[in-house]
Amino acid sequence: RSLPSTKNWTHAIYFRFVIADYFISKVAKVLYLDADIICQGTIEPLIKFSFPDDKVAMVVTEGQADWWEKRAHSLGVAGISKGYFNSGFLLINTAKWAAQQVSARAIAMLNEPEVIKKITHPDQDVLNMLLADKLIFADIKYNTQFSLNYQLKESFINPVTNNTIFIHYIGPTKPWHDWAWDYPVSQAFMEAKNASPWKNTALLKPN
């Protein structure tokens, strides 16, 4: 509870550290996904993937090169200029994660006042700081971010395509809200829900 949190990022964001540590010595790699991600394609390439010895994780970048440069400067880590990633998708090399003591070092950094002053996305920024130059960058299809609020705009570019594997529903509106289920991009979630044991569970209503 001593770690930084905000209204948008509760202490649940740090569960990815616990998950990674739990699977050390149990499996060679583990796939972490945020709870607001839905799968609409095969993950067989991830299952078959073998990490080179010097890489800790596979990730997907967000933003463009100019954004990466800004994050590298503000976080004080030059390697981030090669790619700043969203921590909602992490394919983790468990042996390397353990060898690098990523979880322990991240938690230690999150207790340092000087680090806290720099960060805006607590777990994500710290992981970018720790893992720069130790990453494999995957195609955006493995973490395609989309806010349902985009659909309120007169025009927008939908990044979700038939090739998208993981749709990451960012923003405050989620497909499990009862006012958002019928958006086209929500249908992947609805199909999964209707095929699940929770098919008869009501969608969330406004508070």
Where are these regions (language model features)?
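Conserved PLP-enzyme active-site core in the AAT-like
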Residues: 27
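A glycosyltransferase accessory/donor-loop signature
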Residues: 87, 92-207
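Short, P/G- and charge-enriched loop/turn segments at secondary-structure junctions
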Residues: 5-8, 74-80, 152-155
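Catalytic metal- and UDP-sugar-binding loop of GT-A-like glycosyltransferases, i.e.
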Residues: 33
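A recurrent flexible, glycine/aromatic-enriched loop bordering the glycosyltransferase active site
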Residues: 78-89
